[in-house]
């Protein structure tokens, strides 16, 4: 018999990855059906990065050694893509200054993964 699960014991990293993937899919659908011009490019760019990092996060969530790296990646994808999404929806263009912060976080997540793997093997 399996123990009962509750919202307290659920895997929040998996929840974050799933919600991130849903957001990316909705952004892509919105871009395809309701937008034109430069905002479409912003939505597509955000969607691609967010969907890729959501998928990677889901895979990394199963290894305790890599979970911190996955959290960094998913946070970076949220900041990167989120800033592009809000600009596409009409927010001031200065939100574009936030986008590189998300990119740096995604890179840091990948670097974290590489360092943990190398140090684990050493």
What positions do the PLM features span?
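Polytopic transmembrane helical bundles with strong interfacial aromatic enrichment
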Residues: 1-122
């Amino acid at each position: 018999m399996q123990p009962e699960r509750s919202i307290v014991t659920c895997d929040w990293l998996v929840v974050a990855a799933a919600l991130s993937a849903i957001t990316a899919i909705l952004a892509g659908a919105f871009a395809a059906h309701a937008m034109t011009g430069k905002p479409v490019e912003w939505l597509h760019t955000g969607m691609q990065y967010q969907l890729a990092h959501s998928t990677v996060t889901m895979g990394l969530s199963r290894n305790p050694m890599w979970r911190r790296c996955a959290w960094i990646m998913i946070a970076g994808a949220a900041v990167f893509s989120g800033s592009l999404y809000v600009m596409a929806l009409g927010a001031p263009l200065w939100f574009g200054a936030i986008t590189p912060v998300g990119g740096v976080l995604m890179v840091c997540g990948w670097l974290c993964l590489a360092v943990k793997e190398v140090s684990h093997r050493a």
